[in-house]
């Protein structure tokens, strides 16, 4: 996939000189692994050879794991990361859309968080603003939730759509949210599965290549990546998250993509609900023009940046105002209803979900068999509700999966009954857990109580999770 701004291929003699010797002939995989293990530079030919080995089965699982660990420990420079991204993108099918759509084709991606249901709200809101959003999303793995699993908690919703079906949905609705097929970026699928079991997830070049290779095949003009940092994020440190953000922007430019990266805090859950069905309910509240302020704020900010960068708004503020209007006037909710119907949900159910009250919606979606409330152990101001321990307990209860393909319980989750910054009296309920199995164990209760952090300072308004926006060097 030749893209504007991509560095020219290295000549064989240059590649050999930069990479620690050798000629233009393909190196064997053990030699490539040794080179990167020792901190060497992989040439374009080296990287493409490795990706070809993934695809034709020459690379053994042990060799894949060894190469990933070498990259994790030694890193990759901009050129190596760009070539890896491009090689992964070229390993499968490219999606093609009408040329007249190019400026409208946009997307958003998140590095993963707890309670992160932004995509469910943002995709239809952008469609209501005239965008085309061919969102290829993922499933939950570990403590982070997956957009596909949330949508599949809605009876009938199908995340499997052919390119032809995606084209039709984009024409009629303006957005679709689908899963990654075996034909789209298959080499990334191999690396993604291996990274999860080899402790190589938290690598800037590997994350960059994985995200951007999937987005490159979507044929986008503009992408905003929500890079999480904090206690429940891949990178707890904001500076490391900023490093990833800058790499995403620079590699995206080489692919001809207009990429910006938002740094957003992930210490507390986003919104008040965590768990697949509960997050769908909260997304519908936001699409009603209501919902928790932190969720609405993030949707509006990310959407405003996308409209501005794609040339569909003159400023970020103007773009944000358009997204807010789509939430408030019902047009985003209508697009969500159309998307549900287009992706397999019975039109009557889609209509009932989008027009019903919160109580009615809960009856239409899968829900857990019982609920337990936790009481505050002391008086104080809610300083923080740690997202990671909360997510880990919900994972144990069946809301998450430890391996790909493992079934989940869509109704399992938790509702926060308090907001960060508010006063909480001893004995007051602060968390409602929805569960299917036995009652919470004493250890699970201790873990959840440890997630609640109280202080003695004055009540305060919780800050927005949005920290900063990393932009390409030249912006509209």
Curated annotation (Swiss-Prot):
Show the segment(s) annotated as Disordered.
Answer: 1-26
Q: Summarize the subunit comment.
A: Homodimer.
| Class of enzymatic activity (EC top level) | transferase
Enumerate the catalysed reactions. Answer: thymidine + phosphate = 2-deoxy-alpha-D-ribose 1-phosphate + thymine
What does this protein's UniProt record list under function? Catalyzes the reversible phosphorolysis of thymidine. The produced molecules are then utilized as carbon and energy sources or in the rescue of pyrimidine bases for nucleotide synthesis.
Q: Tell me which GO cellular component terms the UniProt record holds.
A: cytosol
Q: Keywords in UniProt for this one?
A: Glycosyltransferase, Phosphoprotein, Transferase
Query: Which parts of the sequence carry Phosphothreonine?
Result: 6, 475
Pathway in which this enzyme or protein is active:
Pyrimidine metabolism; dTMP biosynthesis via salvage pathway; dTMP from thymine: step 1/2
Name of this protein: Thymidine phosphorylase
User: Per the record's keyword annotation, is Cytoplasm included, yes or no?
Assistant: no
- A Pfam family annotated for this chain is Glycos_trans_3N
Q: Where is the composition biased (Pro residues)?
A: 1-11
Q: Which InterPro entries match?
A: Glycosyl_Trfase_fam3 (IPR000312), Glycosyl_Trfase_fam3_N_dom (IPR017459), Glycosyl_Trfase_fam3_N_dom_sf (IPR036320), Nuc_phospho_transferase (IPR035902), PYNP-like_C_sf (IPR036566), PYNP_C (IPR013102), Pyrmidine_PPas_bac/euk (IPR018090), Thymidine/pyrmidine_PPase (IPR000053)
The source organism is: Rattus norvegicus
GO BP annotations listed? dTMP catabolic process; mitochondrial genome maintenance; pyrimidine nucleobase metabolic process; pyrimidine nucleoside metabolic process; regulation of gastric motility; regulation of myelination; regulation of transmission of nerve impulse
The UniProt entry, under NCBIfam families, shows: PRK05820.1, Y_phosphoryl
